[in-house]
Amino acid sequence: MQGSHFVGTSIAILPGFGATNCSIDTSQVPCPIATFPQLAEKQRASHFTRNWHTFGAVQNVSPVGRLAPRWTHSAHSRYPIRVKRKREVFDNLAVFAHFSAVLDSLYPLFRAGLFQLDAETAHHLSLSSLRAAEKTGVLSLTCPQDAYASPVEVMGLKFPNKVGLAAGLDKEGNTIDALGRLGFGFVEIGTITPRPQAGNPKPRLFRLIPHEAIINRMGFNNPGIEAGVANVKASRKFSGVIGFNIGKNKDTPNENAADDYLICLRAAYPVADYVAVNLSSPNTPGLRDLQGAEASARLLELLKKEQEKLAAEHGKKVPLLFKVAPDLEEQHIADLARVFVDGGLDGVIATNTTLDRHAVAGHAYAAEAGGLSGKPVLEKSTRVLASFAHHLGGKAALIGVGGISSVEDAKAKIAAGADLVQIYTSFIYQGPKLVRELAEAL
């Protein structure tokens, strides 16, 4: 396959890094499909032997459309005529792989440029660029919808693959379609609270580049649950699973926290595939107190009763999960696991960010208040995950998140008991290539 020329186009698929206008001579980038044997073989299996009605409407193949061939039948045979469609799909995969390789090769350059900006400015620029790239069709050249599919069923939900985006990147739920194009099997938006809130004063987001880590003290800045629901309703192209991560407003006292969670649960229920209750952010004063066994039991009881009512009202069950901190001791984990099993919790997300700074001691930002995420939290987070897996005994689903930056890390989470995994910080540092690698490997 000869290289093509892709000139003067705005390339904008850079989480945390933004976009730039540039001229690219892709003929200098080796991109035949043979360069991607694992991808090619996986796509042969997934798209040539499986019907894609599960994840979206079946339609004709096009270079910028979903890889979902419409089978036609011959009057002379009871079998579908697939040869032409197979060839079209395979040729399109070469195009997609070509553009993906171009962007992967440019990624370090984009990252270096965006890392010159304030972290939060780069964050917003990146999300707006992603949305623009999705609307203009640029993303469809790099990743066809459902291209990295290895379906798995968890909590009664069908996930296109095991790799999700953790809460915190898309706080408003307005970038879901674009993120889905990058290969995520599920996207968790938020944290979202009942009322809009601005969050903590800036600066509140810090990169610890040598450690591939981030410290944030954002403070649940979000547009409020009504806006979040409206944004999700507008996301019509993503065929994966959408989770709502919900929290309480900063000015809501803990004794009234259940009211905030109930407001969010009711509002999100019609459009959410699952709802995650954030009890573990270190950036809302007193929030982690809700992780106490008694407080969690009371909250879970109220939420489960509401879940049952909403399930009857809407004719579907939306799984309920709790997101926990990595800074839990073994006895605390055992107590919480007992509460979760007794209360019928559907799943646990392990874990949130850590307050521990030992792994980044000496860095200029180590003393900044907030939660630490990225590579330094891997060991601590995986320990908590494994402990929950032991105490839950398979009676609740587990999503492993925290420090995943490679296929080996993700497999370690699965080995520790995770049914699914999520990434965030490593996505900022490594880009969409990591999503594809994880989705193909798990």
Task: Describe the role of every protein-language-model region.
Residues 190-240:
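A gly/proline- and charged-residue-enriched helix-loop-helix capping module
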Residues 32-38, 75:
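Residue-level detector of structural "landmarks"
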Residues 174-179, 330-340, 405-421:
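Catalytic cores of alpha/beta
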Residues 188-194, 349-354, 410-437:
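Glycine-rich phosphate-binding active-site loops on the catalytic face of alpha/beta enzymes
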Residues 131-133, 138-145, 282-295, 338-394, ...:
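Glycine/Thr-rich beta-alpha phosphate-binding loop at enzyme active sites
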Residues 249-261, 289-295, 321-341:
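Active-site glycine- and acidic-residue-rich loops that bind
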Residues 199-212, 359-370, 427-442:
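C-terminal helical cap(s) of enzyme catalytic domains, especially alpha/beta-barrels
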Residues 213, 223-226, 230-239, 293-314, ...:
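Alpha-helix-loop-beta-strand connector modules within alpha/beta enzyme cores
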